[in-house]
Amino acid sequence: MKKLIEAALPLTDINAKTIREKKLAPGHPAHLHLWWGRSPISSVQSALAASLIDAPESDEELKSRLARVQSREVPEFGKKPTILDPFCGFGGVALAAQSLGLPAVASDLNSVAVMLTKAATEIPAKFANVSPVNHSALRKQYFGTEGLAEDVAYYGNLLREKAWEKLKDIYPNEQEGTPSAWIWARTVKCPNPACGCTMPLASSFILCSKGTNEIWAEPVLQDGAVHFELQHGCCPKEKMSNKVGSQGAVFRCPACGSLTTDAYVKQMGSSHKLGAQMMAISLETEDGIKYIAPSEKQMHAANVPIPEDAPPGEIPDNPHWFTPPGFGLKNYADLFSSRQLTMLTMFCDLLPEIQDKAASDALAAGMDASGGSLSNGGTGALAYGQAIGVYLAFVIDKIADANSTICSWRITGNSLRNTFGRQAIPMVWTYAEGNPFSKITGNLSSTLKSVVNAIRNLPIGSEVSVLQQDARMATYPQNIMVCTELPYYKAIGYAALSDYFYIWLRKSLKTIYPELFNPMVTSKDELSTCGQYEGKHAAECEQTYEVQMRDVLAQLAEHADRNFPQLFFFEFHKGDELALVNGNNGTASPFETLIGSMLHAGYEITAVWPMRNAAASEKADGTRVLIAARVHDKTEQTTRRGFAAALKREFPMVFERMLCAGVDVSDEKIVGIGAGLSLFTRYKKVLNASGSDMKIHDALELIYQEILGYLKEKNADSEADTVQLEEE
């Protein structure tokens, strides 16, 4: 039976909700932990609902069923399909399935992705409707994840109290207030032998800017050394920074005027001769934020030894995503100051004590004493204490994101930027070291609150099983309905980027999930990892990806439930459309390659829908699309001429119906490609006059011409109607 997603979708409404979701209101599950390229829950919910609702025969009934998609109403029927997401990432698909009451199996090779998905779906279901076990809980009845959230808040505050007692000496207050941040500049020895002073490498000396009222740290030479004096007013342009140009590590020495070269700074960094100097301190006072010059007390407090148990982990030598290794910062621990390392390792080291306290309280509250550990499926007191530990480990990870030497300072907001402002780790020259016990961005209290609010809103509607497995070698249950974001090998370096968090999760959670966190770093042998950025040729990477993706799709097809469409999200790039306009020079575009792999695996494309994460923009390179496909044993074949005739005859009606529920003009062509592919891929073969198989590119070119013709006629009719109305 044809499903609604294969006929029409209220696309404008769905995309508007998805774009609103991207703003991440407090309590959104994404606040549990950072992940890149998340599956928006709202659009997946709509796609799943539309895949379960039968397509109607009448236009009147179509309106009714489209309304059910907008309200995400799942039809009641016997056995519900099991949703499979073999590239689960953050767990957005599993969350969407769970909220609709659909059972799901989610898996990923990446340990961080598996842990996030377990925490978002699997763990809350284990402890649904439990009452808090801490002694300060006031209510008697709790629903959903309310009790779990309240306990995470309680034991998180206990972690903060214990950590403060251990760390207060290295985070001293001033008489006027509490330091919220210490602002630093990296340093290097001046390359001029006649000077040789320790010079700052400051991308900005400005600390605060409100119109023409600015505060800046001015480097001053005294007794052969550079120190900083704070100035107020309008900072002269030449004093805003000693960075020269926009490219490379070129800085001017404030003492002698000599310039560094990028090569010199990299050489000094590789010799472990990069340092850092405190420029200023941001204070929280009764009158607001105030800036003061560094004091001996504050500089002494920051000068702590690197902890011996700092987590190991080497940063990949991959300048596409990581700039710091080129300057000698080759390990993840090198991205943190010694005080930041001390603070983060202390949080991790205190976690077992907090878990034991939570488990002891759970036992006293009546939880089962013999339930086993969390990793073995336990649901008793031990597992509950460990679950608290998982969410507090996420709090520590989020603090690590806001507390590294990659965090720059916002001069207009008196706050710091997180490490991951984008999907890479750049080199930062002027950085801010936040105080986790203050009110600054990324402090422990506000971070804990954001995680707790996210837990409160997690669904517990159905069973979700989360596994660590490689999609290329996994075994899947029969009769599954696939819904997944297909990775593209040149998009995001998930494995490499996630190691930044993995090293801290491993330190926090290895005793709870020993197998998941056994390796020193995450596996880099995955579909989304591009060897091109590690020295391999682009053609070799592309071929490897294509072969492996084809095998994965074939494996999924073998286990697909043929009663339902299978759903694949993918990135459709401008280059994919340009290949249809200008030709592809004999090289298949990524979209063509994917369609080819799907046909090879036995799929029939039934629709392609633009499922946007952001509003349409000329600057955007790609559009997230949803490909709906069926697994069929196709027997019918036709000729190129026969396909062209079918396209002329059937395409307008199919395309018109797909557009009827509301599709933005910017999305019409992609929807048309789906309509055309539904006609092309229903055949086992389409043969050229020579007897050879018709190429997908050739079919897409024919489809594209039909789309342009249809839209031209549609727009002409619309203009004619407008003229007629004006005349009347």
What residue spans do the PLM features occupy?
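Nucleic-acid modification enzymes, centered on SAM-dependent nucleic-acid methyltransferases
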Residues: M1-I83, A94, Q98-N479, A491-A538, ...
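Conserved beta-strand/loop positions that form the S-adenosyl-L-methionine
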Residues: P86, S107, T484
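Conserved SAM/SAH-binding loop
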Residues: F90
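A short SAM/SAH-binding and catalytic strip from SAM-dependent methyltransferases
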Residues: C483-A491
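Extended, compositionally biased non-globular segments
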Residues: E540-V547, K574
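A generic structural signal for short
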Residues: Y545, N582-G583
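A short glycine-rich, Lys/Arg-flanked "PGG" loop and its adjoining helix->strand segment in the class I
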Residues: E546-F564, G596, H600
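Short beta-strand segments at enzyme active-site cores
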Residues: P565-F570
